[in-house]
């Protein structure tokens, strides 16, 4: 749901392609796509819920017609809500036992507890209710001080540590997007931060392992994400995009917006 357009993609996994070949297990294959000129969104933020709802409905309908499928739930890209990144380190005692799924669940739960405590209004550090957690990504495990562990399950140790990359966004902005999508009779399965999605869709494994910065300039926002060690370690979005360049060209040359957009695109 962007400033310049609203897009809907319908994907299928693990099914035969039109040429008779089978897609790789878990590999999504686009079977429908729809897009509409965005109305009611400015600099990535919804300013008119009715207009945004109409654009979402039309984009989804177009994708459904192409895919010949009817969808009831969606995953929504999020670029609004002033996303914030923070790295939080957490330790748990293992007692020399073998690490399993329950230990990972325990350390992730402790991460969320520490975040809520740090943002408790009684501590004078703001209110956690003002921001909604979008992503909680482990960016590095260590066991008894040994770093660089990708997956600690099955290993033994006394202390398990993890650095968690937490990405949050304004609760009000998220609720507004939910309201617009709900009015289209669609259930939201989850949110994906736009710069995170941009990195996942464009980077190869070597790039994300060695370290890379992804910059995605949209119509009303520009997003940035940094990947290292195969994971996103930082993300941010600013409310400035290609439309601002178009407006500057139009003002500088005293030409209509449509002409300025063409000049920007060509040159």
Map each language-model feature to its residues.
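Nucleotide/phosphate-binding catalytic cleft detector across ATP-hydrolyzing
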Residues: 1-213, 231-233, 256-267
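Glycine-rich phosphate-binding loop of actin/hexokinase-like ATP-binding domains
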Residues: 164, 210-252
């Amino acid at each position: 749901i962007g400033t310049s357009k609203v897009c809907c993609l319908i994907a299928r996994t693990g099914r035969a392609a039109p040429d008779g070949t089978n897609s790789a297990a878990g590999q999504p294959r686009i079977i429908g796509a729809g897009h509409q000129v965005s109305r009611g969104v400015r600099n990535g933020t919804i300013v008119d819920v009715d207009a945004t709802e109409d654009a979402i409905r039309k984009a989804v309908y177009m994708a459904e017609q192409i895919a010949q499928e009817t969808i009831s739930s969606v995953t929504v890209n999020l670029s609004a809500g002033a996303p914030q990144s923070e790295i939080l380190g957490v330790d748990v005692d293992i007692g020399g036992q073998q690490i399993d799924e329950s230990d990972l669940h325990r350390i992730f739960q402790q991460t969320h507890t520490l975040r809520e405590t740090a943002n408790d209004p009684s501590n004078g550090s703001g209110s956690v209710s003002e921001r909604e957690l979008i992503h909680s990504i482990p960016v590095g495990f260590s066991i008894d001080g040994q770093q660089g562990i990708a997956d600690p399950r099955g290993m033994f140790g006394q202390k398990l540590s993890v650095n968690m990359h937490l990405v949050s966004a304004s609760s009000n902005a998220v609720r507004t997007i939910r309201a617009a999508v709900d009015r289209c009779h669609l259930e939201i399965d989850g949110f994906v931060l736009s710069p995170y999605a941009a990195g996942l869709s464009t980077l190869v494994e070597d790039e994300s392992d060695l370290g890379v910065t992804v910059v995605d300039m949209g119509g009303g926002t520009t997003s940035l994400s940094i990947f290292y060690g195969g994971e996103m370690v930082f993300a941010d979005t600013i409310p400035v995009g290609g439309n601002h360049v178009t407006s500057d060209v139009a003002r500088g040359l005293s030409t209509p917006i449509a002409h300025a957009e063409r000049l920007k695109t060509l040159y």
